[in-house]
Amino acid sequence: MAVALNIADLAEHAIDAVPDRVALICGDEQLTYAQLEEKANRLAHHLIDQGVGKGDKVGLYCRNRIEIVIAMLGIIKAGAILINVNFRYVEGELKYLFDNSDMVALVHERQYADRVANVLPDTPNVKTILVVQDGSDKDYRRYGGVEFYSAIADSSPERDFAELQRERSADDIYILYTGGTTGFPKGVMWRHEDIYRVLFGGTDFATGEFIKDEYDLAKAAAANPPMIRYPIPPMIHGATQSATWMSIFSGQTTVLAPEFDADQVWRTISDRKVNLLFFTGDAMARPLLDALMKDNDYDLSSLFLLASTAALFSPSIKEKLLELLPNRVITDSIGSSETGFGGTSIVGAGQATTGGPRVTIDHRTVVLDEEGNEVKPGSGVRGIIAKKGNIPVGYYKDEKKTAETFKTINGVRYAIPGDYAMVEADGTVTMLGRGSVSINSGGEKIYPEEVEAALKGHPDVFDALVVGVPDPRYGQHVAAVVAPRPGSRPSLAELDGFVRSAIAGYKVPRSLWFVDEVKRSPAGKPDYRWAKEQTEARPADDVHAAHVSA
């Protein structure tokens, strides 16, 4: 008997509806829904046979490839909880994550074997290890690792998990570990039903209404040809997990690639006739734009939607993409691991605004003032984004942070991760940025994303982050850490004159550091700790003499 709104059930409804349809494509490999089911069932049975219990944690330490989706589905079919592992983590971070998540099993790519070998002695609960071949020759047998397909080959391909006491529920837990901008990663715990509703396609984004029946998406899949969807951020990011599960539940075809290569993205869109491209802000959009400006001979006639989420997407880049790709829809959405989808905007030519994204929020997202009241449209009051309704249970093993982020105000429980915004007169919301990285200069609160967007509009700036640095007069002033385009080195005076047309004078950077590359997460998230370290490690390359003391 199917249990409504469990992720495994929702996937199986689509598998039953379109078994022979291609579910996944990666390079020259592809898998139908029936093949995905068979391999995921084998993995689930193998994990159960290895002693992985209901609710146990299984790590996924892989780039985007077919095996990571097999593993995602197989882990959930086994009644376990998948743990996303950032493949850029060093050994100390891996040890923390393995330990904090109570991980008992791990699926990892072979290239990470040395790191895994060094971490396992300190994390003895990780006993079952499956290794995905990736062309590397690292030794994984020294710690008992077993090749992925060899391990599952003799396991049952049957869908008989209820008989194995792996009952499913809408209350089963799904965990997203956040990279965050400060501190160690935290595991955000969601009920399956809640994360399905706000992140995995259980709401009609056009109407804001819930999908009524658990079979509706599968029925629609059987009645319509598939869309070809291409999420390019790594699967460690909630945005790509969201795009992938939405594709699976609705019987679409998902294209994956282990590495982000802008030229290859456009070739893949052309070769695979991709319809929808998903990415995370400027860190991906700018290289994509540069590649397209260099070579615009790709056949992109199939592509009709470019969707960015969860990272700064600068107006200047939106405008140029619209110029090069006319008659496409470009969307810019807000959301987080703690809230799911929060709102979106559709960008048209000439409509890109300065500052943070201006979005239409969904009816479960509000902006609250300091007293916990909803901010009135056009009031000019800065408030904080809050989400009600289907929100997480809390952070795994962190009651203090749970109490700080998930609050009950006037009898309503909200998720409040710390993003500030203003409500415009027409009811749309302009995002200002995360409060934890805001800069206080002379009593004025400055949000980095607005300044970064202005800087990145300059033709000589490839990427930039801004942070606050000590100032004897103002307490802090805005400092820019800039990666210029090759052969360029814009002065602070040039940047000052350029950005003043987009932002107020008190927000303009007063000191400047040049770097070869701005450090970001694999999904393009800014690393403000790293940026702050750059300003502390050496003197600025340029300062505004009128505003910064020598």
UniProtKB/Swiss-Prot annotation:
GO BP terms, alphabetized: cholesterol metabolic process; fatty acid biosynthetic process
Catalytic activity, reaction form: a medium-chain fatty acid + ATP + CoA = a medium-chain fatty acyl-CoA + AMP + diphosphate; a long-chain fatty acid + ATP + CoA = a long-chain fatty acyl-CoA + AMP + diphosphate; (25S)-3-oxocholest-4-en-26-oate + ATP + CoA = (25S)-3-oxocholest-4-en-26-oyl-CoA + AMP + diphosphate
Identification of the protein by name: Medium/long-chain-fatty-acid--CoA/3-oxocholest-4-en-26-oate--CoA ligase
EC number(s) per entry: 6.2.1.2, 6.2.1.3, 6.2.1.42
One Pfam family this sequence matches: AMP-binding
Keywords: ATP-binding, Cholesterol metabolism, Fatty acid metabolism, Ligase, Lipid metabolism, Nucleotide-binding, Steroid metabolism, Sterol metabolism
Residues that, per the record, bind ATP: 178-186, 419, 434, 525
Family: Belongs to the ATP-dependent AMP-binding enzyme family.
Function: Catalyzes the activation of medium/long-chain fatty acids as acyl-coenzyme A (acyl-CoA), which are then transferred to the multifunctional polyketide synthase (PKS) type III for further chain extension. Catalyzes the ATP-dependent CoA thioesterification of the sterol 3-oxocholest-4-en-26-oate to yield 3-oxocholest-4-en-26-oyl-CoA.
EC category name: ligase
GO molecular function: ATP binding; long-chain fatty acid-CoA ligase activity; medium-chain fatty acid-CoA ligase activity
Pathway listed: Lipid metabolism; fatty acid biosynthesis; Steroid metabolism; cholesterol metabolism
Region called Disordered, residue ranges: 525-550
Highest taxon above the source species: Bacteria
